[in-house]
């Protein structure tokens, strides 16, 4: 089952990141995020607060998509998260759950027109 959270956001540029956020940077884009609660546990719902800091090109970022997959198992999350916009470059995603221990790949897609820029982070979830 493919789960994704989608939210429309406006153009983002390099930003000041509040304490407690982690930056995720590629040559093309940058976001900052934090988990709530901070420590992820197997089978526990959590939320993500995300700031879209920078994306390529002149077009505004119109969507941010958050998803999680287990590459070794070929599946994703069992629940469909919900995104809520908090500001033009900031949003909160709830209803996230990593239901198994192991390596998860979390992807954050910034969508501008026909262009999609992906940032990803692997998380090793212990039992």
Give short role names for the model-derived ranges.
Residues 13-105, 109-127:
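Contiguous segments within soluble domain cores/interaction surfaces
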């Amino acid at each position: 089952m493919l789960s994704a959270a989608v939210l429309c956001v406006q153009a983002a540029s390099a930003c000041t990141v509040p304490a407690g956020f982690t930056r995720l940077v590629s040559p093309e884009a940058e976001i900052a995020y934090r988990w709530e609660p901070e420590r992820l546990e197997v089978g526990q719902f959590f939320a993500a607060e995300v700031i879209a800091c920078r994306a390529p090109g002149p077009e505004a970022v119109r969507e941010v998509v958050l998803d999680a997959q287990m590459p070794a198992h070929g599946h994703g999350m069992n629940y469909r998260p919900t995104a809520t916009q908090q500001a033009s470059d900031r949003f909160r995603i709830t209803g996230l759950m990593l239901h198994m221990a192991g390596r998860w790949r979390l992807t954050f897609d910034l969508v501008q027109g026909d262009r999609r820029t992906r940032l990803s982070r692997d998380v090793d979830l212990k039992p």
